[in-house]
């Protein structure tokens, strides 16, 4: 009886082992078959699954010569092999683009460093203002993209010019902006690369951050920093008019400082008072015989300023003081031309003048 029990047990174990072995073989066969089939991810492109034991470099080759199992794979997948090769080429192109982009970034950084170093050098050639503005616009596009900053006041000439240079470039690609920036620098300084490398080894970030001079703060923001820009030089009397300091203003005039003294932009204290909206200062200056028709370097009078800044009370005061409503600036515009507000009195004044 005991022998029969052992025999039955052996048979059962044998059956179990046979079942497991058959299952294992089935899994292996299924796995191999899966390796030879094409799978597709719902959100990704076709993937080429290669069978075990086949050299992947051979499957990626554009040549023939596949045998046996490899030939069967190509027949099943159709054009998937060519897609895979195209994908590999695309990845290689991306790699090259990355290298080119890095080289362009480095060249652009070297160019900007050279420009800031040249700007700090007073012996360097003077760059025309229109070129400065163009460089500024290209720099902003390359580093920040399209202009989204609000338009500065018309009275902030430098800031407005920079904003316009940036804004007119629209959605120019940063890479194109970098290339054009480098091109302009090369036109200005054909040997800039040698100088740029030397400057980089000497100055570094300090040279860039402290640069001022002919180029001005070319890479600064649009904030019009009147106290730090070397482009604008004002005397104390202009500062008092700008800040509305009546007592100090009167002391300056009484000490002999001309009431129509001009700053580096041709502005008088009256221009500054109106720019900041100080009607009381304007009245003090006019009382001290300030010229209500004085023109700055752009040909604009205090009335131009009042109209552009939409300061009706000051504009009306100036007109009553015989300010010329028809005075033309360098662009050929009079205060009347620039007036966008509905001020009947300024129209009536212009008619009376005619």
From Swiss-Prot:
Membrane-spanning ranges? 11-31
- Keyword Transmembrane helix in the entry? The reply is yes
Q: Which GO terms describe its biological process?
A: lipid transport; response to hypoxia; response to lead ion
One Gene Ontology molecular-function label:
lead ion binding
Q: What is the effect of changing residue 140 to A?
A: Loss of palmitoyl-CoA-binding activity
Q: How does it sit in the membrane?
A: Single-pass membrane protein
This protein's name: Acyl-CoA-binding domain-containing protein 2
Q: What is its main location?
A: membrane
Which residues make up the binding site for an acyl-CoA? Answer: 136-140, 162, 181
* Residue span, ACB domain: 104-194
Gene3D superfamilies membership = 1.20.80.10, Ankyrin repeat-containing domain (1.25.40.20)
Family per UniProt? Belongs to the ACBP family.
Induction line = In roots by lead.
Q: Which domain of life is it from?
A: Eukaryota
| Bias (Acidic residues) ranges | 86-96
Which lineage? Eukaryota, Viridiplantae, Streptophyta, Embryophyta, Tracheophyta
Which sections of the protein are ANK repeats? 265-294, 298-327
